[in-house]
Structures are given as structure tokens and as C-alpha cells.
Amino acid sequence: MNLELFTELAGGLDHPEGIALGPDGLVYAGGEAGQIYAIAPDGTVEQIASTGGFMYGVVTDGDGNIYGCDFGRAQVSRISGSGAIQRYSNGTPDHPFRVPNFAAFDDDGNLYVTDSGGWADDDGLVYRVAPGGSTVVWSHEVPRFPNGCCLSAEGDWLYVIESRGRCISRIAIGDDGSAGPPEVAVELPGCQPDGIALAEDGTMFVGCYRPDRIYRIPPGGQPEILAEDPDGVVLNQPTNVAFVGPELDRLAVSSLGGWSVMVADVGAIGLALRYPKVGW
């Protein structure tokens, strides 16, 4: 099942769900007690903050701030490199965050945030948080537990995992920033997809909460199982994936069910991330 591809980058983390590469070359991950971890290339781990919540997806800006989807506090928390914690957004007055799950920046510093809602309620939302924290509901049309997300290379599509929909949907981003009608890009029956990362050639890599599986989906092609762990030892609820390293040539995988971040050479180069200067 290709598990031999994977080695441990770092261990001793508290059930990391989200993972992201920062502009400083460090890998950032969250923990189930609200921890924010910084992982050096040699695997050294430093806990730089804890919100006391439950950290899901994480993303960084061009100034080294970390934005964590804090399920425990129902907010997006902004954490500076020194560990100072601020509330960046808690949704809108009419639609406060319930399950902020993952986030992705565009070039202008707008942060797209998925809120999964209730598992069986199909009431998930996607928010758009402008630089500084002003927040609107951007789309309510991918309601089936929206989860991991990322922007296309050109920044004109937002790809969203719908975990309960067993699919990857995509939403066109208009010139004015508005959301177009969604369309299903890839069906993933028989699993619970969670996180997504794009390679520079458009290949999608998808981590699944159930079963312990990672998919590779070539452009215009069918999903292929890259790796699967029937014992949940190497890949233990591999919820999120991110390309890391100076050349973006290794795929890092978080383990919500365990304590480690694994990495593998999967024969692909990651799409360069956006690190906007957000200010605040």
C-alpha cells in the first residue's frame, strides 16, 4: 500500500489535524488542545502557542502570522510568530462560526474559510474574510460538510472538499470576488475525504479521515489510491496534506488519530502557496 514511502518528520504532537508550510520554511501544525506547533526541517518541534481550543486547519501569511481554524473557540485565531493570540474572525452576526475547519488565502489577502456545520445537517458555509477581519458568507452552495480547501494556480477557482458529499467541488471566483455556482470536480465514493493539496501540474492529493487513505488525482483523470494503511499505524486518520521542503517536493501528512507528521516523496512538486501581506 506504498506505506514504505513515508517517514516521520516529527512526533509527539497532540493529534495534529491541520498542517501548512510557512514562508520561513517551517511546517506548522495544530493540536487538539489548541496548540500551534512549528516544525523545523530536522524534525525539531516547538510549541509556540496554545489557544485552549481545538485547532483544525492552519495557514500562514507573508509576515509569518498563523491563522488557525479554532473549533474549540468557534473562531479563526491569528497567532504571531512570538505566540501572541488574537481573534481574527468569528463569522458574521447572523452566521457565527460553528465548525471553522480550513482556510486558504488569495493573492489580495482574502481568507476563504470553510465552516462544516452539522455532519448530517448539510448546512455548511464558506466565508470570505477580508484583510483586517471583515467577514461575509461567501457561499452556501457546498453544504455537505465543507472541509479542506485550496485555490487554483490562477486563483480563479476555490476547490472545496465536501466530506459528506464524498467529492471535491469547485467554485468560480468572479472578478469582483463573488462566488459562482459550484460544480463537482471529482467524485470520491466510499471514503470520507478531508484535506487537499495541489501539485504544480494540477494533480490533486487528498487525505481521507476514513479510511486511512491518500488519493492522487491527475488532471482530467480518475482517483488513484496513492497509499492506504489498514492498520492506521503509519497513516492514522490522515486528514490534511501539504507540500513542504525548499523545493516543495515532499508531501507532509497530518495524523488526527495519532501524534506525528509523516512525509513522502510522491513524485510531484507542490503548487506554490500564497503568502499575502495582510497587515492589521
Predicted regions and their residues:
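Anionic-ligand binding region
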Residues: 159-160, 164-196
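Structural recognition of the beta-propeller blade-terminating site
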Residues: 40, 79-80, 130, 172, ...
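Beta-rich, blade/repeat-based domains predominating
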Residues: 10-24, 33, 51-67, 75, ...
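A short loop-to-beta-strand structural motif that recurs across blades of beta-propeller domains
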Residues: 35-37, 75-77, 124-127, 167-169, ...
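Structural signature of WD-repeat beta-propellers
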Residues: 31, 40, 71, 80, ...
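A short beta-strand motif characteristic of beta-propeller blades
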Residues: 3-10, 43-49, 85-94, 134-140, ...
